[in-house]
Amino acid sequence: MLSRLAQASRLGLMTARLSQPVASPSLRAIPATAPHFASPWLRSYSKRSSGQPPKESKKKPSQAQNDAEAAKTPEKPAENDVNKASEQSPEAPKEGEQIPFHKLPDLTQGIPSTLFEEMGGDKKKEQQALQELEEAESKGNERDRSEYVSTSERNRKWWTRFMLTAVAAGGTLSLLYMGRNWEDTIEAERHSDSPNGPSPSLWWKRAKARMTESVTYYQEPAFEKLLPDPDPTFERPYTLCLSLDDLLIHSEWTREHGWRIAKRPGVDYFIRYLSQYYELVLFTTTPYATGEPVMRKLDPFRLILWPLYREATKFEDGEIVKDLSYLNRDLSKVIIIDTKAKHVRNQPDNAIILDPWKGDKDDKNLVNLIPFLEYIHTMQYSDVRKVIKSFDGKDIPTEFARREAIARKEFQAKQLTHKHKHGSGVGALGNMLGLKPSNMNMMVSPDGEQNPAEAFAQGKMLQDVARERGQRNYMELEKQIRENGEKWLKEEAAMMEAAQKEAMNSMMGSFGGWFGGNNPPEKKA
């Protein structure tokens, strides 16, 4: 409190001196900022920037008050402060130099303010303090940038460790669970190489077997046997597998028409003619949902006995493969016709690869293959793979027609010299084709047909007799389809509707049993 009074008295003395008329050069030399250096608690008004002389103050301090304050405060310290301030100020005039009146501060309106200078000084001090602090930290506590780890980086590392630990724990528990003993005797018999037991090796074998099964479920065909066991009464010893896309049909999409499907020329004749010789199987990579509606239109009378879709194929090395070993048929009597060699890479000796059909309406490649397939059935070869191998690298229809023409020429020449030997026609045909027939199923003629001996005497070959019989059977089938085709389709639709109703009734009966209802009454026979 006393210090404030002392400062106030000192201020009053300085104010009184400055308010008096100019009398002393020493007082004129006092700069305008002297009160600021004399006391940090003083605030005054700033100087006028204009050169106009200040107006007279309306309120003048009394002389008695100035004298009283001057008596209380010694004059010498104030003069020392003023001298110090004049030395510190760079703009202060030299000693003895008179200051112009318009440059003096206007004290009639009060003491000039030093607020802006104080605030500017405080900011400079703060900035200087911050710079000093940063320099001190950089020098004293300096560390490498690589040692700094942000919060997000720490969180990421924590979650990474947590996830790795969880995965390791889950994998260990899964391995222990999958390595348990087999639950029934059927599984134990199916995995005889990994029997039950507590040893770690057997545990690992069982876990490996279960993991392999879980993966092969999506890679292997839906069933181990895609076709039922062959019927002994079914008089078709050979199986012919046909692809769908670009072999029997061609599908394309356009902006104008959307999806359109074209049927290959001669497909109906090809299917109906060979159905008397082969067990026809559709083996395609098209899914069931897409291929089944197409097959209903393509083969409404079900001459293709077994349709196999994408679900029956095998996924191997990133590609879809048609594995014939799952057909439940003797591979020596299986032929597959496809447009892509990679689809039949597991059994290439059983495959006939044709060029993809792209919609050409004059195409005859499929129909031209009928004589070769008919000849295989006629000669009853024990292994069709050897026959197909003999045409390796050649166009089968063209090469077969060439061999048949040579055989016919030789046969006719021998017929002229050996008319009494009718069996020579069969031997000449097989020898010229480079094939040896194992059984001649055409030697016994049905009722109403020409005897083979008579046919040979007329210059006909065995293959000619087989074609005549095949054409008669085909014409009979066409007649049956024309007369009874609609009836067959209606009967099939009625059977399907009855099966659907039966399935619906069975399902509703099951629901009634679950919810406590009565079972539907059984129909009396």
Curated annotation (Swiss-Prot):
Intracellular or extracellular location(s): Mitochondrion inner membrane
Domain FCP1 homology, chain residue ranges per copy: 233-376
PROSITE patterns: FCP1 (PS50969)
TM stretches of this protein: 162-179
Region (Disordered): 35-150
Mitochondrial intermembrane side: 180-525
Membrane-protein topology: Single-pass membrane protein
Predominant location category: mitochondrion
A single BP term in Gene Ontology: protein transport
GO cellular component, one term: mitochondrial inner membrane
Similarity remark: Belongs to the TIM50 family.
PANTHER family: DULLARD PROTEIN PHOSPHATASE
Protein name: Mitochondrial import inner membrane translocase subunit TIM50
